[in-house]
Amino acid sequence: MDPNCSCSPVGSCACAGSCKCKECKCTSCKKSCCSCCPVGCAKCAQGCICKGTSDKCSCCA
C-alpha cells in the first residue's frame, strides 16, 4: 500500500496532501488529490481525474 495514498481495492480512498496522481489507485482518491490538467497534456490526462481547473499538473512532468 502506498504510504501517501491509502486505497483499498473497493470502497473509498484517503489521500494525504502529498499524494500525487501517479500514486492514486482509484477514482475517489484521484478526485480528492489531483488537479485538472491543462489542455494538451496527454500524459497527465491519461492518469488524472480532474477536480478543477489548473495551469499546472504534478503528474505531467
Swiss-Prot record:
Provide the positions where the record notes the PTM Phosphoserine: 58
What family does this chain come from, according to its entry? Belongs to the metallothionein superfamily. Type 1 family.
Binding sites annotated in the UniProt record for a divalent metal cation 2: 7, 13, 15, 26
One Gene Ontology cellular component term attached to this UniProt record is:
cytoplasm
Looking up Gene3D superfamilies in the UniProt record yields: Metallothionein Isoform II (4.10.10.10)
Which positions are annotated as binding a divalent metal cation 1? 5, 7, 21, 24
- Residues involved in a divalent metal cation 4 binding: 33-34, 44, 48
Q: Which residues are reported to carry the modification N-acetylmethionine? A: 1
- The answer to whether keyword tRNA processing applies is no
Asked if the keyword Acetylation belongs to this entry, the reply reads yes
Q: What is this protein called?
A: Metallothionein-1X
Residues the record lists as binding a divalent metal cation 3? 15, 19, 24, 29
Could you tell me which residues belong to the region Alpha?
Answer: 30-61
PROSITE patterns from the UniProt entry: METALLOTHIONEIN_VRT
Keywords of the record: Acetylation, Cadmium, Copper, Metal-binding, Metal-thiolate cluster, Phosphoprotein, Zinc
GO MF annotations, alphabetized: metal ion binding; zinc ion binding
Q: Which Pfam families match?
A: Metallothio
Q: Which PANTHER family match?
A: METALLOTHIONEIN, METALLOTHIONEIN-1X
Binding positions for a divalent metal cation 5?
Answer: 34, 36-37, 50
Annotated a divalent metal cation 7 binding lies at 50, 57, 59-60
Q: Which InterPro entries match?
A: Metalthion_dom_sf, Metalthion_dom_sf_vert, Metalthion_vert, Metalthion_vert_metal_BS
> How does this chain assemble?
Monomer. Interacts with FAM168A.
